Regions:
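Extracellular glycan-recognition regions
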Residues: 8-239
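Beta-propeller blade signature
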Residues: 1-5
Length: 239
């Protein structure tokens, strides 16, 4: 919430009296003089517009040639990586988590990625993990204490029959399960559950990326949120 104090906007609630507002998980809807239906920000994206929805945020100031929206798909061009992990990579296309439990699924065509390039689905924070196409494999990579420059570790990998794949992350509170599939119906878990952590002031985010040298790119057909299935919640609680 925001209020005006001495002609200055004060954001959040000052619960401890130190003069600094703090974020809240719930707050009464403000009285704006008329009734409006409750609405939530857009989350899923079919990539049918000629510009990104307002829910998307680049990890740093964007460059126009990082992406292209055309023919109902998002094209992310590979951008060279200059560090041991993605903490300082500017070309991460992310959005804030919409709920405590959810799934995100995307369809990735990686047939135009070149050698040394990687593209996939990411949970970003101080610790991060992702599932991605790397050559003819699907890989799970993780970095713990990424802000300190910790290199990524390869948690798991599996060979692909082709370079188009469905990628999914199922989130239950802080537990994230990454999986992949060939038909969009049956998904195979890859690697262990990842316990997400917020990333300094930005919190934890979910999104897409494409990295590596050269002129390759990855095409994403859509990016869809859905409620977390009961089976996924049960698996997370069992860990």
């Amino acid at each position: 919430p925001m209020k005006w104090l001495n002609d200055w906007p004060v954001i959040g609630l000052d619960v401890d009296g130190d003069g600094k507002g703090e974020p809240v998980t719930e707050h009464r809807k403000p009285n704006v003089g008329r009734e409006y239906p409750a609405q939530a920000p857009q989350t899923s994206d079919e990539f049918t517009s000629n510009k990104l929805g307002l829910q998307w945020q680049w990890h740093a100031n964007p460059v126009a040639n990082w992406m292209r929206l055309s023919q109902g798909r998002l094209r992310l061009h590979a951008v060279p990586q200059n560090s041991a992990n993605l903490w300082t990579a500017p070309n991460l296309l992310l959005q804030k988590l919409p709920a405590r439990t959810f799934t995100v699924t995307t369809f990735l065509d990686g047939s135009h990625l070149r050698e040394g390039q990687r593209s996939g689905l990411l949970i970003m924070g101080r610790d991060y993990s992702y599932i991605a196409i790397d050559g003819t494999r699907v890989v799970r990579m993780t970095s713990i204490d990424a802000a300190k420059g910790t290199p990524e570790t390869n948690d798991a990998s599996v060979d692909l029959k082709n370079r188009s794949v469905f990628l999914r992350v199922s989130v239950n509170d802080a537990a994230c399960e990454f999986s992949y599939g060939g038909d969009g119906k049956k998904f195979e878990r890859l690697g262990e559950l990842f316990p997400m952590k917020p990333g300094v002031w930005i919190g934890a985010k979910v999104g897409l990326f494409s990295i590596g040298p050269g002129s390759g790119y990855a095409d994403f057909e859509w990016f869809r949120f859905a409620p977390l299935s009961q089976s996924a919640q049960t698996r997370a609680l069992a860990q």
